[in-house]
Amino acid sequence: MFLIFDTETTGLPKKWNAPISDSANWPRCIQLAWQLHDNNGKLINNNSCLINPNDFDIPYESEKVHGISTALAKKNGLDLNEVIELFLNDLKKAKYLVGHNVKFDINIIGAELYRLGISSQFNDLHVIDTCTELTANLCKIKGGRAGKFKFPTLIELYDFLFKESFDQAHNASADVEATSRSFFEIVRSDVLSKKDFEDFNQLNNYLKSNYSSKISLYGLDHVNLKQESSKLKQVSTNKNIEILNSNDKVINKNPFVHLHNNSQFSVLQSTSRISELVKKTAEFNMPAVALTDKANMMGAFHFYRAVKNFNDDDKNQSNKIKPIIGCELNICENHNDKSHRDDGYQTVFLAKNKTGYQNLIKMCSLGYTDGFYYVPRIDKEVVEKYFEGLIVLSGDKYGEISNKILNVGEKQAEEALKWWKSIFKNDYYLEINRHGEEEDEIINQLLISFSKNHDIKLIATNTSKYISKEDANAHDILLC
């Protein structure tokens, strides 16, 4: 028999080659769907289960892909033990395990079995993958490695075989039906052969005698997970965020200062000239401005000199600017580990005195001399050594807290926040961003909650990469 299965998860692993015993590396399974077919391809059993996330939550970016929210999974999900038991009962009947990019799904279920203390159940099964060089050469989609054709996604393979799309891609239930249909079609059309699996001839003969053209759909109904999740959404993501009017006394009393600015010294990332940054700061009557270039402080001297020249001008004596020197560093797990790519989280450091400035220089240098791997990096051990005299901002959506909210989970984001506060105490701040992106509202709601629960101050920052609205196009060209 053939068991064809697919999973939906909380995200992707950091290390694709990590063992399944590395539970922190492998994301959690939140939907498991499978079909059991007999040796002639007839559908024997079909199942699709949401899994109740008892000890984790489903991050926003993952929900955007498959539509399964934490609320939906808690409402309709079964316990992991129950789902695994149902799956293993059918798995025991199978000789062949089939999937699209099936190694990932095997690792996901293998990691869940490990968490439950159950030994791997896949060792005795013959694995058949519909995402290989064989299907790559069938679809002939350019863009693969070393000039080869790229491995097709399930959508691309399905479209090539049947000249049609399938509804609800990334719903494991729909993906399994599409994978099943694709698998039996490439058997029927002799894309696979006897060398690919032992019982090919029997299945091939049956399919050819019963399907004169393409393999048909199985007529299964699939729940629209995105619609179901949307029904459970709160009325407004803004209901807990108080927006003050521009003439509010609080705003007038506390003038805004830009604390997260990149300049042209953030190579290929920003079009801002330091002279224009200082000029615009003065134009808006801001009392201070920060320079926080990416992983380097080459612009610090030019920045300080530009501000000093402005302040030394007699006509500016009543409108002096305070220069704040900082840097945006990449904080990874282990800056000495170059066995896999880990760019880390982009974190903003500001020097509040000379000691902080010197420590920031040291950390910045170590990122290049010791930690460079794709990008300059340091780790939290380095931060603990050189934290004195520094202020830390949580960063934008690429900072650790915000990134974990979007891609890992609320609990993990909160644990990371606790670490930063334990080191920097009152010199740690949470950045509220409003870039007009949907993600901002998701992040801001939780940051406000974290701020209240952990007594951490919020600051308003938008990541500045160009000075004027007219420079936006030039910045886009730079990134391309």
Spans of features found by a protein language model:
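Phosphodiester-processing cores and adjacent nucleic acid-binding clamps
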Residues: 128, 212, 216-480
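Short acidic, Gly/Ser-rich segments with clustered Asp/Glu that frequently serve as metal-coordination loops
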Residues: 7-15, 20, 264, 467-468
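Conserved beta-strand and immediately adjacent loop positions that scaffold enzyme active sites
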Residues: 1, 31-33, 346
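Glycine-rich phosphate-binding "P-loop"
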Residues: 67-78, 144-145, 259-272
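Short consensus segments that form the blades of beta-propeller domains
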Residues: 21-26, 339
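Glycine-rich, highly charged phosphate/nucleotide-binding loops
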Residues: 75-85, 409-415
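Extreme N-terminal starter segment of soluble prokaryotic enzymes
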Residues: 1-3, 255
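Metal-dependent phosphoesterase core characteristic of DEDDh/y 3'-5' exonuclease domains
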Residues: 15, 25-70, 88-213
